[in-house]
Amino acid sequence: MKLTKVLFFMNMLSGMGYSIFSPLFPALAIKKRIAETIIGVIISVFDLANTIITAFAPLLFIKFTRIKLLYISTFSEATCTILYGLIGNYFNSYYSLIIFMIFFRIIHGISNGIIATLVYSLTISLAKESEQKSALGNLEIGWCIGLALGPIIASIFYKIGGYLLPFLFLGSILYISVYLSSNVAQEKTESNNLEQGNPPILKFLSHLDILVILLAFFFGMISESFFYPSLTNHLEKYFNLSLSVASLFFMILAIAYIITLLNIDKATERLGLYGSIFIGLLIAAFGVLMVYPYPPFPKSIIFVIIGLTMIGGGSAPIFIPGLVNLSKNIKKIDPNIDEFSSNDISSAINNITIAIGDFCGPIIGGYFSTHFGFKSSCLIVSTFIFIYSILYFIYFRSHIFVKEKNIHFDFDSKSEERELMNYPGLYKENNIEIDINLDGIGKRKRSFNPKLKYNEEDDCHYLKLSEN
């Protein structure tokens, strides 16, 4: 099997394992009188473990081979999924249930962090630069198909056999990932750098451009994860939906994400990488507000669907352009870094930030829902995301868009295309208008007002000159 297909299916299965927990466990925990704040902690420790292991992933890749880590992680992820069902079904002690769930959520988080870092790093490394956005988009589609299938499996098998059956079924399916790992082991890559080590992550985190993008990842993930402890209960309580039906609402995020991913190239072409992130943040902020809308909008299941669709659709323009931006910034910071190491680092930083957002989201959502109610928690989270989207826009407006500059070129005709290269830091964004004075020998000085179009694949600007 082609390696890109193997990575796609591994990511899809990992998404299924991740998404089945949030619809089912909170409902079980509430029946066993576990507070929403504690439920949020149990959900979030997965991402805390994911964050820590991802931070050390480049060091682990030096000490252990990537392939061995992949074998262990895929086996562990499948086993933890089965154990969630067994523990939830047979452990009636309040403290035993919490302790064992937290322990295996940590193990699952560690496994998922290693799988995600390797899968994304290999995908972006094996793709040509012009195809990286599409390759990452396809990989994300695999993850989102998994996120959508998880709640469907939860809904169908919960109706058939209660809480335990969905976890037993999905855990058995996830053992397919162990087989897929053997395909990765057999595949030879052109660079033969699968077992090469990486430079430390920390030196890249001191750069403000990278930190600003990572904060966008963080708030994007908060928008998706803050209602994990509360949404199922909210839908059951206020709209009288059964657990099997309420579980399906988690799939709306994934479907909206997939649809947006299919059009991500068009979006980034029109808005640019930085503009796409800004628009994604705005859409996510208003989507969170719509999940429990304030007047004049009525409280309606239609608005819940619209809100979840906006959150899922807004996430894609944040994560995919952001990851491409990360990889480019890392190469600029360290021009000597090799392709695999650069993508290991960008993948690790991306996964760390998303895991931190996924860790904080359920805790924030559980706390606010417990103390202020679900309605207020939506308003608070939406406000924070909106404020950051404005700060993000101000920062990149001042750093990316370039003021007028004079550049001298010779020209042969009144209207022609010219390629501007080797001007580091001069042009950074789409459709910047500048005045260019062209001084030709034996020709009179003339002023032109060109339109610049930045070609991200070639990392240069193409210029159409027309005489004023």
Which role fits each region the language model picked out?
Residues 138-182:
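Helix-loop-helix hairpin linking two adjacent transmembrane segments in secondary transporters
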Residues 104-142:
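Cytoplasmic helix-loop-helix junction between adjacent transmembrane helices
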Residues 76-94, 283-298:
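C-terminal ends and interior cores of transmembrane alpha-helices
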Residues 54-65, 260-272:
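Helix-to-loop junctions at the C-terminal end of transmembrane segments
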